[in-house]
Structure formats: structure tokens, C-alpha cells
Amino acid sequence: MIYLAGGASAAMPTVTPLRTRFDADRPVIGMVHLPPLPGTPACDGDRDAVRTRALEDARRLEAGGIDGLVLENFGDAPFHPDDVPKHTVAEMTAVATEVTDAVDVPVGINVLRNDADAALSVAAAVDADFVRVNVHVGTAATDQGVLEGRAHETLRLRDRIDADVAILADVHVKHATPVGDRSIDRAALEAVERGRADGVIVSGPGTGAETALEAVERVADALSERCSDDSEPPVFVGSGVTTDTVADCFAAGADGVIVGTALKEGAETTNPVSSERVGDLVAARDADSSAD
């Protein structure tokens, strides 16, 4: 059940729950960090190279045993705060179409820095499973300026275009400072209860930075206490996960992890994906599962 302001409740439009979209009980989601897209400062104009790299990374993730992936315009810095240009949406849709055709795992879309409408539109067009939204509710001070959540717009757009696309919302998102004094567990509850997010992400301060396990525990406990088993939104750890820390993330209450840097050759964020590193991390997850 989702609770609205004043204690009222309402049924959400039918969206396939995040937990049922993955074959694994504790999914490992890998990042496909797109090179700079056409129209961005660092782009060399080679569209074929962008698509080739995206497909190679997606296939390597799948070959390593990944449970899902997120396609993200990581190379587009400096990022537009929210409304990205139409050509960015077009490029991401074209690449996402090829990626979803090439792999047989759930795919998510993230349009940086915080264009949830664009991400949702791309996801709906290519039949992706979910979107990641950096600031879904609340306000964050970032290097793009002050970003405000637009949950009211995102949910209405999803309903209007009849998209079976789940919303995975960051709480106290990385590369940002939350405005106000809401605790991370309160922020997570508001993302779910008032923002109607289908799942939440807890991250460290930046890309590849370790996530505080205490924060994961607080968010997981808060959602567990408030929600029934059937409706409890999953909690994902969104940065700093490695083969050495993945078991600790699940022990802290995470339901899944999103991994980028640790799956790249040499553990460098901008390098290609290494299938071997993917396999090692998935094996570490599985070894922990078998020990339970």
C-alpha cells in the first residue's frame, strides 16, 4: 500500500514490481557508461563508436553473468541539470534499442543529470524495465546547480503513456548534498510513500566511492517496518561495490547492487567492461548466498 499526504491511500497504476523483473533474488546490475554523445563537448562525432562500445559492454556484462544493466549517458559532462536536448534523447533511444535487442537481461535507463521524463520516454520506447532517477523527490545541491524532484510529473507521464517501467530513485544521491535536514531513512520513506518510487538506491559520495553500510541498514529497516513483505520496495547499493564488499552490502539489508567501476578493466570507470571481473563479482555474491 502507498500512503499519501494526510494518511489516505490509493492504488498505483499496474507496474510490474522490480523484485519480479530479475531472475536472481539478489540481483547484480552492471553499468553501461556511454561515451560522449553527439552534441556534447567531448564527443568526436563517431556515432558508430558509441554504439559499438555500448553493445560490447552490454554483451560482456551478460557473458559474465550479470542480472541486469543500466544504460547511462555518463560521458556527456558537463551535464544538463534536467531537460536534456532532443538529440540526446534520440541518440539514447537509438543505442538503447540495439542494446535491448542484443541482451536478454532487464535493462534500465538513466539520463543524467536528472531528466526523468527523458529516461522514462526512452525506456517506454525500447521496452526497458526501469529508470534510475537521481533526484525523484526533495532537493539537492549539485555541480549542476540546485535540482528539484519532479515525482509529480514523472508519475503522471508514466500513467499517460501507459509505460510498464519501474522507478528506481536515489536517496541522498552521490555527487550532491541534500538540501534540508531529512535523514536518509526519512528521505527513502518519502521517495516511496509520497514519490511512489518502486525502489530506492543508497550510494556513497561519488562514482566508485564506497557506500556507508549504516545508511543501507537504516533505509532497509525503515522500509521493512513501514511496508508489508509483498509491497516492500527493494533497496539497492549504488556505488563502491566490489568483490570484497558485495556480501557486506547484502548483510546490511540491500536487496541488490548496481556496479560500474569494479566491473571495468583495471577498475577504471571509463574503461571497457571486463567479463572476468563481472564473473568474479557475481561469484562472490553466489558464494555468500550458498553460505546462508
Regions found by a protein language model. Give the residues of each.
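A charged helix-plus-loop insertion that forms the helical arch/lid used to bind
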Residues: 85-92
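Haloarchaeal acidic low-complexity proteome signature biased toward cell-envelope/secretome components but also
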Residues: 1-25, 31, 51-52, 228, ...
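C-terminal helical cap(s) of enzyme catalytic domains, especially alpha/beta-barrels
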Residues: 145-153, 259-292
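Alpha/beta enzyme core
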Residues: 29, 34-82, 95-105, 114-232, ...
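Alpha-helix capping and helix-coil boundary motifs
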Residues: 14-17, 45-46, 183, 270-273
